[in-house]
From Swiss-Prot:
Protein name according to UniProt: Na(+)/H(+) antiporter NhaA
The keyword Hydrolase is assigned to this record: no
Function: Na(+)/H(+) antiporter that extrudes sodium in exchange for external protons.
GO CC, alphabetical: plasma membrane
HAMAP family: NhaA
Record membrane topology: Multi-pass membrane protein
GO biological process terms, semicolon-separated: regulation of pH
Pfam families: Na_H_antiport_1
Main location: membrane
Keywords: Antiport, Cell inner membrane, Cell membrane, Ion transport, Membrane, Sodium, Sodium transport, Transmembrane, Transmembrane helix, Transport
Organism of derivation: Yersinia enterocolitica serotype O:8 / biotype 1B (strain NCTC 13174 / 8081)
Transmembrane segments: 14-34, 59-79, 95-115, 125-145, 154-174, 179-199, 213-233, 254-274, 287-307, 328-348, 363-383
Record family assignment: Belongs to the NhaA Na(+)/H(+) (TC 2.A.33) antiporter family.
GO terms of molecular function: sodium:proton antiporter activity
Length: 392
């Protein structure tokens, strides 16, 4: 196991615990006398004006559109590294987690649609339970220490990375509405420039980030979700240069602590603060939150485990070393922790709709994710050997 992956897992796990704390603080503030301060903080107007460019948004949207673009930049860097020389490099390594991830996205979406498919508005949230919060899941897994085999951690990492890639595609295809062709054309020119820089072997990360900033503005103005700029830049930064450097890994190494310890916890703090005022039992047991919670807690493990089992039984893929199906099932339950990624998709799905839809969708996410975390931890604790003396 490379030092980079080992460090990645440590940062994600610790960041997951901070993320949980941030969410709890947000929930407390949103339902206490501090509620006014909490809302005022999120509504603080922030403006950037450069020549004719004027971007004015409340702080909440700067977090969701700006800081989350940095998160997706790191996702792009991770996916590229893993595809080229990591846990997803080559068919044999990639096929098992890829099939598992596919099942883990299809089943939750189908279960959600069983509850909400008949409603024209709420059916827009079909992708909410399809996401996995890797930081949260690894944070829960970290509670079991070195009892967890390295191969099981890498399986969760690979599955979650493919899941992230699927979420990126879903956002691009299904949650983009009005499009400005002029801004999109400028974005295409920026992408072409990034591709040319990669082809010419430009190794200066700052050059990619500068063009990436222009790309972010163009995509933001185009109507496509601006976080996609981060993924594109991540894929364009070279993994290796002729002088044996790795601009991609250096940037990933530098950004990871900021993402794990600041950006994702701040996103959780900004988005998990659901006010329970006006929330009713009938609303909490309505089809929207039930569909989301069922998709996360039932659909995720059902899809991941069933697709994994079929892939092995049909000879399409092999079970990774030192892993059994009991452990796969426990991890598949942990993957039902959608949390930040599910909240992010919910904010896109119900943008401009009745605020109650966002409120109840967040409650469904919290219910499903918390249940998946508790049950997944308990099942994994039972599925693992009592003590591991071998360190990796």
């Amino acid at each position: 196991m490379t030092n980079m992956i080992r460090q990645f897992l440590r940062q994600e796990a610790a960041g997951g615990l901070i993320l949980i704390f941030a969410a709890v603080v947000a929930l407390f503030m949103a339902n206490s006398p501090l509620q006014g301060f909490y809302q005022s903080f999120l509504d603080v107007p922030v403006s950037v004006k450069i020549a004719s460019l004027d971007i004015s948004k409340p702080l909440l949207l700067w977090i969701n559109d700006g800081l989350m673009a940095i998160f997706f930049l790191v996702v792009g860097l991770e996916v590229k590294r893993e595809l080229m020389e990591g846990s997803l490099a080559g068919r044999d390594k990639a096929i098992f987690p890829a099939i598992a991830a596919l099942g883990g996205m299809l089943a939750p979406a189908l279960i959600y649609l069983l509850f909400n498919g008949a409603d024209e508005v709420t059916r827009q949230g079909w992708a909410i339970p399809a996401a996995t919060d890797i930081a949260f899941a690894l944070g829960v897994m970290a509670l079991l220490g070195n009892r967890v085999p390295t191969s099981l951690k890498v399986f969760l990492l690979a599955l979650a990375i493919i899941d992230d890639l699927g979420v990126i595609i879903i956002i691009a295809l299904f949650y983009t509405h009005e499009v400005s062709l002029q801004a999109l054309g400028m974005a295409a020119a920026a992408i072409a420039l990034l591709g040319y820089m990669n082809w010419r072997g430009v190794g200066k990360t700052s050059a990619y980030l500068l063009v990436g900033l222009v790309l972010w503005v163009c995509i933001l103005k185009s109507g496509v979700h601006a976080t996609l700029a981060g993924v594109i830049v991540g894929f364009m930064i070279p993994l290796h240069t002729q002088d044996k450097r790795s601009p991609s890994e250096s940037l990933e190494h530098g950004l990871h602590p900021w993402v794990a310890y600041l950006i994702l916890p701040l996103f959780a703090f900004a988005n998990a603060g659901v006010s329970l005022q006006g929330v009713s039992i009938s609303g909490l047991t309505s089809l929207l939150p039930l569909g989301i919670a069922s998709g996360l807690f039932i659909g995720k493990p059902l899809g991941i485990f069933l697709f994994s089992w079929l892939a092995v039984k049909l000879g399409v893929a092999k079970l990774p070393d030192a892993i059994n199906f009991k452990q796969i099932f426990a991890v598949s339950v942990l993957c039902g922790i959608g949390f930040t990624m599910s909240i992010f998709i919910a904010s896109l799905a119900f943008d401009g709709a009745d605020i109650a839809l966002t409120t109840y969708s967040k409650l469904g996410i919290l219910l499903g994710s918390t249940t998946a975390a508790v049950v997944g931890y308990s099942l994994l604790r039972l599925a693992l050997p009592a003590k591991r003396n071998i360190t990796h």
